[in-house]
């Protein structure tokens, strides 16, 4: 799950480095571009093209704040995964995502998932919320970052997420 911000900070050389990194990742390992994109439809279309066509990533993280039309250009790539930020692992997530916004996001993403390629980003720092979100989202994949340095505990997270759904971490 390469975080694009570290590559973008290096300018053109960073994009060249990103391409080199992608080439050494084994073909059987999915590449999730941790980009957290979210923009108007036309801009999102260009971001989707760059990450899913040009760079050939298998999935991408996106921000739902601008609504469905900012996510559709990504989800229209039906063979690619799109992980929508729902309840993130950073400490500031409580500023907006709690107590209720994350539930609204889960509901909307479930409604928008017409191609079956949407999933949610749900931080491991909130294991007590995972089953609550699952009741709303249904059986879609979750990307669960935040184990380790950010404070999420693997055992608590796995226990909370246990429902038979394959969960990429």
Predicted features, each with a name:
Residues 13, 46, 69, 104, ...:
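Conserved active-site and cofactor/substrate-binding residues in soluble primary-metabolism enzymes
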Residues 24-28, 54, 77, 112-115, ...:
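Alpha-helix C-cap/termination motif
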Residues 35, 39-121, 139:
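Conserved anion-binding
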Residues 6, 88, 124:
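Residue-level signal for short, function-critical loop segments
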Residues 2-54, 129:
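N-terminal active-site wall of soluble small-molecule enzyme domains
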Residues 124-168:
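A C-terminal functional module that forms or caps the active site or interfaces directly
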Residues 16-27, 46, 50, 73, ...:
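Alpha-helical scaffolding segments of alpha/beta enzyme cores, especially the outer helices
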């Amino acid at each position: 799950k390469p975080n694009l911000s570290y590559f973008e900070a290096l300018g053109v050389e960073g994009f060249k480095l990103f391409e080199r990194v992608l080439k050494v990742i084994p073909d059987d390992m999915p590449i999730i571009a941790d980009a957290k994109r979210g923009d108007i439809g036309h801009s999102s279309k260009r971001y989707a093209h760059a990450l899913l066509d040009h760079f050939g990533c298998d999935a991408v993280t996106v921000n739902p704040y601008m609504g469905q039309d900012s996510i559709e250009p990504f989800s229209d790539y039906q063979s690619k995964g799109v992980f929508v930020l729902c309840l993130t692992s950073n400490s500031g997530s409580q500023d907006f995502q709690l107590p209720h916004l994350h539930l609204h996001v889960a509901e909307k993403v479930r409604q928008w998932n017409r191609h079956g390629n949407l999933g949610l980003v749900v931080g491991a720092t909130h294991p007590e919320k995972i089953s609550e979100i699952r009741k709303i989202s249904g059986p879609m994949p979750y990307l669960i970052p935040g184990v380790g340095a950010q404070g999420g505990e693997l055992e608590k997270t796995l226990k909370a997420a246990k429902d038979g759904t394959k969960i990429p971490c």
